[in-house]
């Protein structure tokens, strides 16, 4: 009787397992191990025969079944329901009606083809290197992005050494005046001494003006262009430091008041 109850419970357990698996093939029930379920040994043999089929068709449960290789490629799983998905399509729109997996795989393949068909060497034997056309990021939208250096002025090269000495001897404004002056008309070759004397006088006058300007710059700086540079004496310190003559009428007024008060008290 206990063995019969055990066989009935085993048969019931086997029936529940077979009903739980939706894709169980028919050969498992038609095998010789599952024909006679009266004994416990036959029941265990039938369960062993149907166990591989159950493990392949049913979801993976904790146990020895989870050690089997996955039927689908895990790389095909794409989180297309997130908007930051790199390979999926936005808003769940995919090619065909098979979900986001097919469109994601197709897009990934297109990116691999565009990248040069994988990291291996190309047909010409040259390995793909880093992108040379990629510009470095510069914060030009900030005013401190590109520090402005000192502007270099072009160096003027003169054909003869006389003009070089002249450029070193005179300041910039005098050189501009010399450059803007009209050229002298051609003179007779019989009077070269007059041209040399005129040039010597011009250079002497320019040197004298330059020395006078340097002496003027050496003096103390006066802020005459500001109204507080040198205020008049009668307006210094708010007008309190005035001469004694301006205070004479006030002293006379005080004396007259004192005399009047003394005269009234004497009466």
UniProtKB/Swiss-Prot annotation:
Residues 109-133 form a propeptide. Residues 1-26 form the signal peptide. Residues 94-105 have a biased composition (Gly residues). It comes from Sus scrofa (Pig). The keyword Transferase does not apply. This is Pro-opiomelanocortin. Residues 131-143, 215-237 have a biased composition (Basic and acidic residues). Glycans are attached at residue 91. GO terms for cellular component: extracellular space; secretory granule. ACTH and MSH are produced by the pituitary gland.
